[in-house]
């Protein structure tokens, strides 16, 4: 698949164009220079053709962090097949822009000069100044007004190869039901082949370092400056025939310290959690657990995600393994199902073990429990500890059935569902964990009457 890199200095409208092409607000847009710090990648449809588009950070030398941004942007340009170099049309062209553009031309890629912020015909008269760049492929546009953006996209589409068509042969002997079964089987296989993993944690615990260690390359910018990642970064890799997409989320600060663009980043982080399957809760092993860590862990409970607790910076940890685990279990009682792994993203020690653990907890997160076995376990649990009566009347679970996954959701069909105390539900959850491999996943238990629909009940996980 061809790659398109959007390159340019800060605040020329790169992320706005990226969002316009995606037809949604995906990258964070702000008047603050340097909002985009990592390279964002998305698969997009341009006309009848597909491509991967790369939104890069602004190219400008100001400090160490911006030098890293510049380096990653230029690496993206080298990796791309088509380069869209953006400039601010409200300013006169400067020598730095010309030098960068000419250096990009030497890469031998298809390259267009995109002059943004040309909002009307009068402003378009200034475009002749930009012919000094030495290219005929010049596109004066206004992303904010959607002015002449289509002309640019038509040019991009012409540079892309035609979409390959795949011919599928159908056995004429198959009847409709067999075809339907094949289709359903392919759908299930497709659904279970992709795992979305959110990397969560407070500012500067090493989330981006962990992402880079998992991918074995620097995809996310790492800096000693707290809060370097202010957008969510998606990166995919294949492991054991599974497509694992890591979502490096923005570091979450204390609520009182969240301002401006970081507030929007936090909202986007929460939105991304809605599509996540597994959460890696990253903690700094060189520091104690904070209230902020507990608040972030609350998002995992809120979105009912599978979870792995990652004690990062273990190479400089101040506590023994036993002490660290005890602290985690004491502070995160609602994540008692989550396995704990110690590692160092910096040295990459034990990082590779995360992959097998991710596959395991995802399998448990999406598992279907055999109905017969499930009911035997529930029946034995009631015999072992009878459900306390409610208002002087007996309370019984008639039968149990699993009605959904991610996480496993089990309906407890009862004579008096309102009489099942939360402590007994917790007991049942523990019994289920003793009998089934459910490490890493919450369990949702929903008491209900016969004939009551599952979606009418509240979700409570254990």
UniProtKB/Swiss-Prot annotation:
GTP 2 binds at residues 201-208, 248-252, 312-315. It comes from the Bacteria. One of its GO terms (molecular function) is GTP binding. Residues 367-451 form the KH-like domain. GTP 1 binds at residues 8-15, 55-59, 116-119. The keyword Transmembrane does not apply. PROSITE patterns: G_ENGA. GTPase that plays an essential role in the late steps of ribosome biogenesis. Associates with the 50S ribosomal subunit. This is GTPase Der. It comes from Nitratiruptor sp. (strain SB155-2).
């Amino acid at each position: 698949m061809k790659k398109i890199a959007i390159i340019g200095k800060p605040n020329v409208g790169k992320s706005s164009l990226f969002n316009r092409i995606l037809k949604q607000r995906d990258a964070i847009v702000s008047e603050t220079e340097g909002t985009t710090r990592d390279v964002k990648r998305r698969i997009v449809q341009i006309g009848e053709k597909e491509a991967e588009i790369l939104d890069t950070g602004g190219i400008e030398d100001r400090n160490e962090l911006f030098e890293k941004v510049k380096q990653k942007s230029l690496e993206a340009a080298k990796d791309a097949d088509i380069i869209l170099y953006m400039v601010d049309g409200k300013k006169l062209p400067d020598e730095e822009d010309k030098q960068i553009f000419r250096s990009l031309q030497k890469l031998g890629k298809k390259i267009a000069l995109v002059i943004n912020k040309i909002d009307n015909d009068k402003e378009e008269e200034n475009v002749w100044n930009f012919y000094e760049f030495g290219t005929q492929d010049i596109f004066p546009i206004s992303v904010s007004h959607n002015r002449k953006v289509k002309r640019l996209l038509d040019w991009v589409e012409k540079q892309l190869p035609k979409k390959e068509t795949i011919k599928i042969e159908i056995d004429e002997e198959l009847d409709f039901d067999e075809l339907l079964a094949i289709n359903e089987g392919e759908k299930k296989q497709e659904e279970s082949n992709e795992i979305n993993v959110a990397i969560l944690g407070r500012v500067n615990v090493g989330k981006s370092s962990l992402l880079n260690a998992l991918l074995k390359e620097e995809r996310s910018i790492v800096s000693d400056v707290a809060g370097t990642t202010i957008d969510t970064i998606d990166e995919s890799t294949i492991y054991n025939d599974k497509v694992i997409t890591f979502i490096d989320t923005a570091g979450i600060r204390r609520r009182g310290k969240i301002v401006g663009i970081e507030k929007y980043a936090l909202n986007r982080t929460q939105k991304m959690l809605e599509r996540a399957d597994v959460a890696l809760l990253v903690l700094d092993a060189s520091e104690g657990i904070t209230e902020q860590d507990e608040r972030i862990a609350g998002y995992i409970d809120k979105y009912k995600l599978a979870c792995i607790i990652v004690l990062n910076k273990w190479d400089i940890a101040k506590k023994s393994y036993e002490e660290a685990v005890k602290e985690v279990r004491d502070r995160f009682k609602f994540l008692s199902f989550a396995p704990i792994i110690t590692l160092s993203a910096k040295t990459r020690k034990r990082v590779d073990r995360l992959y097998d653990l991710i596959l395991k907890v995802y399998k448990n997160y999406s598992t279907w429990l055999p109905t017969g076995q499930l009911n035997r376990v529930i029946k034995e649990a009631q015999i072992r500890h009878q459900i306390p009566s409610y208002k002087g009347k007996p309370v019984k679970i008639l039968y149990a059935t699993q009605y959904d996954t991610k996480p496993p959701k089990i309906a407890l069909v009862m004579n008096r569902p309102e009489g099942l105390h939360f402590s007994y539900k917790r007991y049942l959850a523990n019994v289920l964990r003793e009998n089934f491999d459910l490490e890493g996943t919450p369990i949702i238990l929903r008491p209900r009457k016969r004939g009551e629909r599952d979606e009418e009940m509240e979700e409570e996980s254990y």
